[in-house]
């Protein structure tokens, strides 16, 4: 029998050593024991996979950029090598995302009861995130399918969070942040992105007195990120409009 506490201890140790693949493997084993995760365990799982997938997302962006430059040069051999390497990274990224999505569907979301709103929103947000990461590298019909799955998960989480969580709750705010990024970057829908981010920010500002002391730092940091994105996105839109003359 695997000792759950030992696995969690190993994940904590791996985090300190910045060995995120080990950390993810340990938390995957904890999840597969099929018992509800504590808040700390939930966060360990999230941090582990965020770093594992984050390394691949970053590599993919670098190689994609090199691929575009190489295509312009017209060196066939080099183009082929870069393309093959991008596809290798893509496969790794897809495997990590699939791993997380399987854990979410087979254990984590499945085991949330009707009153565990915070956990349900946390896991549905995670589901939206990992389908969004798949959408970043997917094309054609596959891209359309993962976008649909991402939006469905984000939307379900959003509805639950509005009904059952304070506007200042860091998980509700984090969801609004990522959902709005999904609209802006994946759906290419800046107006929806801005509306979602602005509503979340304004609702939180209106209820600042409900800010929990424990999560004060987390909540205010996410509010700052929402505001930063809004500033960036609205200036982008103004630039676009300015460049197009007086179009409605």
From Swiss-Prot:
It holds the Pfam family 14-3-3. Induction: Repressed under stress conditions such as netting. Belongs to the 14-3-3 family. The keyword Cytoplasm applies. Adapter protein implicated in the regulation of a large spectrum of both general and specialized signaling pathways. Binds to a large number of partners, usually by recognition of a phosphoserine or phosphothreonine motif. Binding generally results in the modulation of the activity of the binding partner. It is found in: Cytoplasm. Homodimer, and heterodimer with other family members. The record marks 57, 132 as: Interaction with phosphoserine on interacting protein. The keyword Zinc does not apply. It comes from the Eukaryota. This is 14-3-3 protein gamma-2. GO terms for cellular component: cytoplasm. Gene3D superfamilies: 14-3-3 domain. It comes from Oncorhynchus mykiss. Keywords: Cytoplasm. Its main location: cytoplasm.
